[in-house]
Amino acid sequence: MCSGRQYDMEYGETAKLFKALGDENRLYILSMLQHGERCACVLLEHVHLSQPTLSHHMKILCETHLVTSRKEGKWVYYSLNRVRAGRAEQALKDLFQEKEPVSDACRCQSERLPETD
């Protein structure tokens, strides 16, 4: 069982990660990066987005550490962070893995006032 603070951090980080994965363009970008490093210009050709929109998506993917970037001259190259991608995969598995059941004893039942006729 997680303490309140650990719970918030664990699920908060997982929620940010899944939010980053919750866009079809970002999923497509990640699938392209599965095959290796890509220049932003190559991504632009395939995703059919404007340059500012691609930059927005890449910022989100980089902030969640799913993607790393490096600049070479005027070009930016992006790569899939396989360690972080593996953690995302594990987070999804953990979410649906059978766990210790939560107590079904409802506290409000014991706090109810007795019913009167």
Q: What residue spans do the PLM features occupy?
A:
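Alpha-helical interaction segments
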Residues: Y7-M9, H46-V47, H65-S69, G86
